[in-house]
Amino acid sequence: MPTIQQLIRSERSKLKKKTKSPALKQCPQRRGVCTRVYTTTPKKPNSALRKVARVRLTSGFEVTAYIPGIGHNLQEHSVVLIRGGRVKDLPGVRYHIIRGTLDAQGVKDRKQGRSKYGTKRPKKA
């Protein structure tokens, strides 16, 4: 417990909040190039083949990013835009690829929640 005199001399240091997405370097999104596109399995108790990509970012980092939605057209050397946001059942995946921008096409035949998957509004028949 510091004395009042010690507190006058030097104030209490503020606790620094650690960022959950350091590779973005305080930016909302970052551009990057896919170095590897593959599937991985989630933690227990879930079971699936989740689509992920290793992305080399313009900030110099190489991160693992999740590819949301059903089906994708990404391959090695695809240019993608990533945002923060982890995938709870995939350890080490702290970023999402934004669908419908750069080389990542939107999800085909999506009717609901289209804005999250980069899908245009369907034409009225």
From Swiss-Prot:
Keyword entries, A-Z: Methylation, Ribonucleoprotein, Ribosomal protein, RNA-binding, rRNA-binding, tRNA-binding
Alphabetized InterPro entries for the sequence: NA-bd_OB-fold, Ribosomal_uS12, Ribosomal_uS12_bac
One Pfam family per UniProt: Ribosom_S12_S23
Modified residues annotated as 3-methylthioaspartic acid in this record: D89
Gene Ontology MF terms in the entry: rRNA binding; structural constituent of ribosome; tRNA binding
GO BP terms: translation
Biased composition (Basic residues): 113-125
Keyword Coiled coil attributed: no
Cited SUPFAM superfamilies: Nucleic acid-binding proteins
GO (cellular component) term, any one: small ribosomal subunit
Keyword Ribonucleoprotein recorded: yes
Ranges where the record places region Disordered: 9-28, 104-125
Summary of the function given for this chain in its UniProt record: With S4 and S5 plays an important role in translational accuracy.
Quaternary structure, from the entry: Part of the 30S ribosomal subunit. Contacts proteins S8 and S17. May interact with IF1 in the 30S initiation complex.
Family: Belongs to the universal ribosomal protein uS12 family.
Record's protein name: Small ribosomal subunit protein uS12
Organism the protein comes from: Rippkaea orientalis (strain PCC 8801 / RF-1)
Lineage: Bacteria, Bacillati, Cyanobacteriota, Cyanophyceae, Oscillatoriophycideae
